Design a protein with these regions (language model features):
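Short hydrophobic beta-strand element within catalytic cores of glycosyltransferases
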Residues: 295-298, 312, 318-322, 331
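Nucleotide-activated donor-binding/catalytic signature segment of Leloir-type glycosyltransferases, i.e.
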Residues: 259-284
Length: 392
């Protein structure tokens, strides 16, 4: 059945009883992408499907991984099936997994794609799996062109993206890039809201848990620290603004030069104004950071989309984001936050708009309604629609 609204058509489907394999990060691998895979698996199970996640035996070789650990130490989830089966660096493994999928004939193989590093592995598996005349390979895609470019990106992307039957993308920038590689069916669905971090806690308790002085107010920068995320611009904007009674919490593990940012903090005289928690923040601590702060800042230089705003939505936390990639599609100005140019001056002005010109009160009134746009059910609906649009 087709429904028409505002010039767009949507294929309404209700697909149950399918055999679905998800391929991507999941327990014991850490991070937001693993959370996405596990949450999508739960939603497809809830809909009456037979679901299994095939995650990695090797995700990244240790010498290529910039963080301290790729793994969590918590027990595996008991409500979904996760099997460690895929090595991204072993072509013989790709053949084994691809032939296994061809033999087991799942209705759908749903892959999570966020970096061309995965392309040789994923593309090889996809091409073998599709050879049974039954299995459709779909992709829920974060990025096409990576934030840090390499000469192999385009050929790797061509190898993988050309092996996929259909896509669900999360920003118009990715949509435009994707069309340069494939004419396969593709639909938009925004990044769903993360709901696995619990609910907001009392601010004083949150401050106690993360070891900060509750007599100060806090603004939060959260997530892995890479150069494209613009923390240096935020620090310089903070130095220009110099608010009284407010500190900036920087919470996340450095995937870039730590010394570069410490040097900025020192040169700008921000040692007393910045609370640095430079480590990976485990899931059970996330809510304390988002409960201690009254706003989140994403000062990115470039982006396609980001999962961090979806954590903020879970806690109804107002946001300041730069107008790059798909961020302004997710965080609408005056609704969930303030959107600004990706410059030091633009970020400083956005901080002043939020805290000195009344925008905080406006956003707090509107953000609850904005949350309704970001459900996991909607994401899985789009995946099922793309499945129905594809041909074996």
């Amino acid at each position: 059945m087709f429904a028409f609204a505002g010039g767009f058509s949507y294929l309404c489907v209700n697909v149950t009883g399918m055999k679905i394999y998800l391929l991507g990060p999941a327990h014991p691998f850490r991070g937001g992408i693993a959370t996405i895979m596990e949450t999508m698996a739960r939603e497809f199970v809830r809909r009456g499907n037979d679901v299994r996640i095939l995650t990695f035996t090797v995700q990244y070789p240790e010498m290529l991984f910039p963080g301290k650990s790729q793994y969590v130490t918590t027990p595996p989830p008991a409500d979904i099936s996760i099997e460690r089966a895929v090595s991204t660096v072993n072509p013989f493994n790709w053949q084994r997994v691809g032939l296994r999928l061809r033999r087991e004939r799942p209705d759908m193989v749903l892959m999570k794609y966020w970096t061309p590093f995965m392309a040789p592995c994923f593309g090889s598996i996809a091409r073998l799996a599709r050879g049974n005349g039954v299995t459709k390979v779909l992709c829920q895609i974060d990025n096409v062109e990576p934030h840090e470019h390499h000469i192999v990106d385009r050929p790797f992307n061509r190898w993988y993206l050309g092996a996929v039957d259909g896509f669900v993308y999360m920003s118009e920038q990715v949509h435009g890039e994707l069309k340069g590689y494939t004419s396969a069916p593709m639909l938009f669905s925004p990044h769903p809201m993360f709901e696995n971090f619990g609910s907001r806690v009392d601010r004083a308790e949150a401050c106690r848990r993360i070891g900060v002085d509750p007599s100060f107010s806090y603004t939060l920068f959260f997530g892995l620290i890479r150069d494209y995320k613009g923390l240096d611009m935020l620090l310089r904007a903070w130095s220009r603004w110099r608010p009284s009674g407010r500190r900036l919490i920087v919470a996340g593990e450095f995937y870039a030069s730590r010394e570069k940012y410490l040097d900025i903090i020192s040169r700008e005289g921000l040692a007393a104004d910045v609370v640095l928690r430079d480590r990976f923040i485990p899931d059970d601590e996330v809510r304390y950071y988002f409960s201690a702060a009254d706003a989140l800042v994403l000062p990115y230089r470039t982006a396609t989309q980001s999962g961090v705003p979806q954590i903020a939505y879970n806690f109804s936390l107002p946001m300041i984001v730069t107008d790059v990639g798909g961020l302004s599609e997710i965080v609408r100005d005056g609704r969930a936050g303030v959107v600004c140019p990706p410059t030091v001056e633009g970020i400083e002005d956005a901080l002043r708009r939020m805290y000195e010109r009344g925008m905080m009160d406006v956003v707090r009134k509107n953000i609850a309604a904005e949350r309704e746009r970001f459900s996991w059910g909607a994401m899985c609906d789009r995946i099922e629609e793309v499945y129905a649009m594809t041909k074996v």
